[in-house]
Amino acid sequence: MRRAREAEMMKSQVLFPFLLSLFCGAISQQIRYTIPEELANGSRVGNLAKDLGLSVRELPTRKLRVSAEDYFNVSLESGDLLVNGRIDREKICGRKLECALEFETVTENPMNVFHVVVVIQDINDNAPRFVAKGIDLEICESALPGVKFSLDSAQDADVEGNSLKLYTINPNQYFSLSTKESPDGSKYPELLLEKPLDREHQSSHRLILTAMDGGDPPLSGTTHIWIRVTDANDNAPVFSQEVYRVSLQENVPWGTSVLRVMATDQDEGINAEITYAFLNSPISTSLFNLNPNTGDITTNGTLDFEETSRYVLSVEAKDGGVHTAHCNVQIEIVDENDNAPEVTFVSFSNQIPEDSDLGTVIALIKVRDKDSGQNGMVTCYIQEEVPFKLESTSKNYYKLVIAGALNREQTADYNVTIIATDKGKPALSSRTSITLHISDINDNAPVFHQASYVVHVSENNPPGASIAQVSASDPDLGPNGRVSYSILASDLEPRELLSYVSVSPQSGVVFAQRAFDHEQLRAFELTLQARDQGSPALSANVSLRVLVGDLNDNAPRVLYPALGPDGSALFDMVPRAAEPGYLVTKVVAVDADSGHNAWLSYHVLQASEPGLFSLGLRTGEVRTARALGDRDAARQRLLVAVRDGGQPPLSATATLHLIFADSLQEVLPDLSDRPEPSDPQTELQFYLVVALALISVLFLLAVILAIALRLRRSSSLDTEGCFQTGLCSKSGPGVPPNHSEGTLPYSYNLCVASHSAKTEFNFLNLTPEMAPPQDLLCDDPSMVVCASNEDHKIAYDPSLSSHQAPPNTDWRFSQAQRPGTSGSQNGDDTGTWPNNQFDTEMLQAMILASASEAADGSSTLGGGAGTMGLSARYGPQFTLQHVPDYRQNVYIPGSNATLTNAAGKRDGKAPAGGNGNKKKSGKKEKK
């Protein structure tokens, strides 16, 4: 009943398109889908309406339908082709390698017929299965070891990789199993006797036979082997031929006789009765029948040449005993013309270097048509416009070669469709698409995203911090496009470079290896290289400039006032008659920072007389705010704080000791008048010092008197000369001894410890090499002359002044060239903003120029108008090489002038020396 219904269905599938062809001119096109078997009902195969070029809105009017309604139907809402029934590949196609359902699709208004092919792919849904639940064997006990027994093979409805692969049995001492392959490729088990049997010892054996397929995961089936040991039968059946051969058309009807096999047995009785059976039962029983008594073989199904061109059947003849014989039957199937060409890639390389030459072979292609004659002659061509072409090498062989230039950066992949067409009527064709990947070569150098890089880094950065990142790109792939970074060059020393910066080879991040110091290094430049990993490698360079920003990490440092060589504080003398605004001294401080961080301000923290002195906010100049009163103490103390402009500000303090006196003699009693405990040794030292001072004063007075008389008689001198003794009086503000050597040839410092029971005088005498040929002190007749302790003879040669060389004009500066300082500003204490570009060498040059002017006699001690007015303490010994930017802080101790001498102008006084008032006080003391 079922067979009749299937036959009727197949008949309708044949008649339906035939009848439709009466109304349609021809099938317009063929649509092909591929699905796995056993899809659930309602599963989507594809959008049939879209593939037919129909819109969803047209479906109701076009009445789209298919002929294979048992398996598929069409959704009129979406146009999808849906599964309508169980699709079992094994049931539909059996053991055919390629299984497809072909049916027609019909549309109306207008009527069209389309041919649809749905390829059914096999899945591993069938486990190997033995037909019989058990296998019975009778083996004579006389069988010798090495005898083989062919067993019934298992059936596996799946094909190719999911089909049957091997057999196994449980371990035992008498038998082993091997898997054999028949000429048609099917596998069957063969039992091998390993050890002689003994019926009296064991009359039967039970084994478990397992068949496994090649699926993933593999499926298996088992059966039992019952072996009964019998008595000996000494003759086995013998076939008339070992191999039977026959040819058969592929479309013969069922039941067609193929041939008869025959075997004979010389035994008699039951041992001579022969029965025939197939060994490879899955193929045999599906397509062929074997009469067990006569040996006649007939067809039992449809033979297809394209599925199998040759069948090999294994036939077993068994007598009434235990002996068997085997033969093979080879059936050749005659072909008919019903196959399209097939394209096979014999050799194929889908990775093509982009620099490949024209004519390079990419693939070797073999075309095959299972048909013969004209229907089997095939031609191939490429459908797309691609830089490739096909060249015929021999019959049925083509090679795919490069026909144009390749550039991976423009096109990385090509899809090439090869169409093969036979010469049949009508012609059949097939197409195969391949994807060709263009492999990269290193033909592009890295490119930085910027032409150059500039980064700003604050000083005192943490070591190891990232300060910049450079980035370069390379359009190549893999190692050819993998960029690594390195430092190629720098304006730093090679040894210093490793301790300053490093760069990450992978990310291009530049790291600081140490904390930067703006005062030591303000900027540096690196040359970074980006290099790919190709062979040969390509690279690119870029410059990275690192600017180190300043932080307020240096507190101001007070240069003046400073402690004496023995640690004692220095004193500055102020005339008792000093008027308000008189320049007493100047606090000189420096700050190693720059910019706003080096802009210094001066503040009075503590004063013994708060209203007696004023302090310039930016200049550091200490001036008298009012005249000295009767109730004011002669000794004054100022505690000054110097702050910079940083955030937060840093500061330093300095203590000024000021004494109101008109001469040195007035200072000594005041200095020594302290309620200290009496010490005989100290008092003795004090008297010795006082005696020495008195002797020196008397000697100096005599020398000054002699020189004054001599100067009156000398009219050739432009200025009044000074004596060439080893000491001269300086009653102005004292400076540290290490700053006393300079352009002035005669100076001494009075250093008295303010908190000591001793009164000490420290004299700094000139060496003969430093003695100038002319007195550099200005024409002040009231100058107090001090006698030298080393030489009581005054050796003065007037001719020296006439041979004094004029100063080099290269060292002179015009008023515009001289740098402005805080003292050159107007009366407000706002100061000037420090210039960060101030050059230390220019300051040194100005100091030397001042020294040259002083030696020439054209400059006063305090500095006249248009001169620099630098004190001797800022001579070559104190060059301020450590001060990069302190113009506002340059002050000439003992003078009321700064670099531009504008302070004197602001006070409305002549630009005379800072010691002028003090010298007049000395003159009064002399009188």
From Swiss-Prot:
Q: Region Disordered: list its residue ranges.
A: 797-836, 897-927
Q: Which PANTHER family match?
A: CADHERIN-87A (PTHR24028), PROTOCADHERIN GAMMA-B1 (PTHR24028:SF106)
UniProt feature, compositional bias: Polar residues: 799-836
The record's Gene Ontology biological-process terms are:
cell adhesion; homophilic cell adhesion via plasma membrane adhesion molecules; nervous system development
Its keywords, alphabetically, are: Calcium, Cell adhesion, Cell membrane, Glycoprotein, Membrane, Repeat, Signal, Transmembrane, Transmembrane helix
A Pfam family this protein belongs to? Cadherin_tail
- Where's the Cadherin domain? 29-130, 131-239, 240-343, 344-448, 449-558, 566-671
* Job of this protein: Potential calcium-dependent cell-adhesion protein. May be involved in the establishment and maintenance of specific neuronal connections in the brain.
Predominant location: membrane
Q: Which GO terms describe its molecular function?
A: calcium ion binding
Q: Which CDD domains match?
A: Cadherin_repeat
Assigned GO CC terms: plasma membrane
Glycosylated positions are: N41, N73, N300, N415, N541
**Gene, per the UniProt record:** PCDHGB1
What domain of life is recorded for the organism? Eukaryota
User: Extracellular side: which ranges?
Assistant: 29-687
Listed SMART domains: CA (SM00112)
Q: What is this protein called?
A: Protocadherin gamma-B1
SUPFAM superfamilies on file: Cadherin-like
